[in-house]
């Protein structure tokens, strides 16, 4: 079976890109008559195609992808079991059906408590059922078993933040960075949570740390729009009249904050301008580009 599709296309998070890919699913899957053949990369692409089809409601093609993976790796393969669970969740008609999925996960975990894909599906399902405290408990149990899962630490941070537990969210992301210190997206996410917390009594210190993490994010990825967006916001907080520079010597001065702010805005302008005329970038990050332009407009109006 030949290569199905460019990996950059199937990894796109935008719904339009997913829809475009899923519409091609019947033709792409039809090329793979020999279900036992194929490279690991091609089966990874089938998995991404499966996710795109589920996201766009093409359940039939998603089932075909799942059958292909199950035939190749076996239905007892943990990754396949996780995808099967995702399919059952996505096609569930009501809450009762979702509760049945949860019961199925509990049964699987009673036989193998460290089935990671099922553990993660269970967490995701608890979140979708608005059982946030149960999801937090489940994630803590997962991390007790696998403390080096940076993705799980990040998800735990999101749950804590949703519950208004900012300190716990910050701790969770700091743990994630111990595992993945060069993950620019995690640095940016930590910067965002610190920025949100900067309205507290400890605001000066948190705002300063927020700027530091956004700077690290764009140092690691020099065209990361989210990092520059956050740096523009966080540096503006340091420039506000009511901000007092903390005694902490690592806090940037007003002059440094001003330079960082101007730099972030200029890079945002450059990124928005270049990506807005690129169809591929526009399709995959339209919402981010619109938000960045809105932020630029806001600062221009206030200057």
Predicted regions mapped to residue ranges:
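Eukaryotic alpha-helical solenoid repeat scaffolds
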Residues: 1-35, 39-42, 184, 190-303
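TPR alpha-solenoid repeat register
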Residues: 45, 78-81, 117-118, 152, ...
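Structural register within alpha-helical repeat arrays
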Residues: 48-49, 84, 122, 156, ...
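Residue at a conserved register position within TPR or TPR-like alpha-solenoid repeats
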Residues: 50-53, 88-89, 126, 160, ...
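Structural motif corresponding to the intra-repeat A-B loop/turn of tetratricopeptide repeats
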Residues: 55-56, 91-95, 129, 163, ...
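Canonical positions in the second alpha-helix
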Residues: 69, 107-108, 141-142, 175-176, ...
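Short coil turns that delineate tetratricopeptide repeat
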Residues: 73-75, 112-113, 147, 180-181, ...
């Amino acid at each position: 079976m030949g290569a199905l599709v460019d990996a950059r296309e199937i990894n796109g998070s935008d719904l339009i890109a997913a829809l475009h890919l899923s519409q091609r699913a019947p033709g792409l899957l039809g090329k793979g008559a020999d279900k036992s053949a194929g490279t690991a990369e091609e089966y990874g692409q089938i998995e991404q195609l499966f996710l795109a089809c589920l996201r766009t409601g093409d359940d039939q093609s998603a089932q075909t992808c799942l059958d292909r993976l199950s035939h190749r790796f076996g239905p007892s393969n943990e990754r396949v079991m996780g995808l099967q669970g995702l399919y059952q969740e996505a096609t569930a008609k009501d809450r009762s059906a979702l509760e049945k999925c949860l019961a199925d996960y509990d049964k699987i975990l009673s036989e193998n408590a460290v089935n990671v894909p099922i553990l993660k599906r269970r967490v995701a399902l608890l979140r979708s059922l608005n059982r946030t405290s149960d999801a937090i408990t489940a994630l803590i149990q997962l991390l007790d078993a696998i403390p080096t899962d940076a993705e799980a630490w990040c998800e735990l941070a999101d749950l804590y933040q949703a519950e208004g537990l900012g300190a716990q969210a910050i701790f969770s992301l700091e743990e994630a960075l111990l595992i993945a210190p060069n993950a620019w997206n995690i640095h940016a996410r930590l910067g965002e949570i610190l920025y949100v917390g900067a309205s507290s009594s400890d605001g000066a210190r948190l705002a300063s740390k927020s700027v530091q993490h956004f700077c690290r994010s764009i140092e690691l990825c020099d065209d990361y729009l989210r990092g520059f967006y956050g740096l523009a916001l966080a540096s503006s907080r340091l420039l506000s009249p009511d901000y007092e520079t903390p005694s902490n010597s690592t806090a940037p001065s007003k002059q440094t904050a001003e330079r960082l702010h101007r730099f972030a805005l200029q890079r945002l302008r450059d990124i928005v301008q270049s990506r807005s005329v690129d169809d591929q970038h526009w399709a995959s990050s339209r919402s981010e580009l619109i938000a960045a332009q809105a932020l630029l407009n806001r600062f221009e109006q206030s200057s």
